[in-house]
């Protein structure tokens, strides 16, 4: 896991996949065909990202979220202030007063957002946390002129150009989605269908929880979480890949993220997390 940078205990456990703040991506030239013109890629900025005390994150919304809904902040399960959730552990609706520094497009902190609760958190099958804030999307936009990042609803595609935007470091990393991992194992934890980056995304500690943004759409397709630091096999800070046949592969220096499309159906009316909703792919307690 990407080190959350909060002390010796967590530093020893969290791996340093550092996601640099998303550098503005160059606009892709529209490719014309006989029938259609593809849209130009959007420049990725820090707008909507947040800095936690130990990690990175972002203010996110589902396509159905309303302006008056309490806003959500997305980060990693291993970034929770309560510590690492154990294998099989799922947190739902836990009170929280955690604060987040909201960043504008250039990476400047413009205000402080406050959580009312940990709406969801786990390190089982995926590595994510969702905080519900005391502010609505409308209040955040009115106060700071910043909109939430939208979550993609479809499975990402290999070869997609992406940017990892770290609010903690105010740095970005740009690369492509290299492929997907059946099971990614690290220490006691196993994550499913993880995103593997091409080598250009050399994320470091503190980038944990950074949004992984599709350069073409500006939507969040994953949340950055780990990387193999020293070539060890399946140990803390050295995840290994396990395919459908049980074959283990170690890729030293390669970093990974967890997909987020499967959590979108879990976000119900009023931005409440409902694990029983149709299509919800998050583990239950």
Regions found by a protein language model. Give the residues of each.
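Beta-strand/loop subdomains of soluble extracytoplasmic proteins
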Residues: 108-116, 158-161, 170-185
């Amino acid at each position: 896991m990407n080190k959350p940078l909060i002390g010796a205990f967590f530093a020893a456990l969290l791996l340093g996949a550092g996601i640099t703040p998303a550098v503005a991506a160059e606009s892709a030239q529209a490719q014309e065909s006989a029938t259609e013109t593809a849209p130009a890629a959007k420049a990725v900025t820090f707008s909507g990202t947040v800095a936690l005390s130990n990690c990175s994150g972002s203010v996110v919304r589902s396509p159905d979220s309303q302006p008056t809904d309490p806003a959500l902040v997305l980060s990693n399960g291993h970034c929770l202030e309560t510590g690492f959730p154990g294998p099989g552990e799922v947190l739902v609706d836990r009170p929280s007063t955690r604060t987040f520094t909201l960043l504008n497009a250039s990476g400047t902190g413009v205000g402080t957002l406050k959580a009312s609760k940990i709406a969801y958190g786990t390190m089982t099958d995926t590595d994510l946390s969702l905080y519900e804030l005391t502010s609505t999307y409308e209040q955040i936009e009115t106060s700071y002129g910043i909109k939430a990042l939208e979550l993609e609803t479809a499975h990402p595609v290999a070869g997609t150009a992406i940017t990892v935007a770290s609010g903690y470091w105010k740095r970005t990393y740009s690369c492509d989605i290299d492929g997907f991992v059946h099971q990614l194992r690290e220490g006691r934890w196993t994550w499913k269908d993880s995103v593997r980056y091409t080598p250009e995304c050399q994320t470091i500690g503190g980038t944990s929880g950074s949004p992984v943004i599709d350069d073409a759409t500006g939507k969040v397709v994953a949340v950055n979480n780990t990387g193999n630091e020293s070539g060890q096999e399946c140990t803390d800070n050295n995840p290994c890949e396990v395919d459908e046949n049980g074959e283990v592969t170690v890729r030293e220096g390669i970093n990974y993220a967890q997909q987020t499309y499967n959590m979108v159906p879990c976000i119900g009316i009023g931005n409440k997390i409902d694990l029983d909703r149709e299509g919800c792919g998050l583990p239950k307690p």
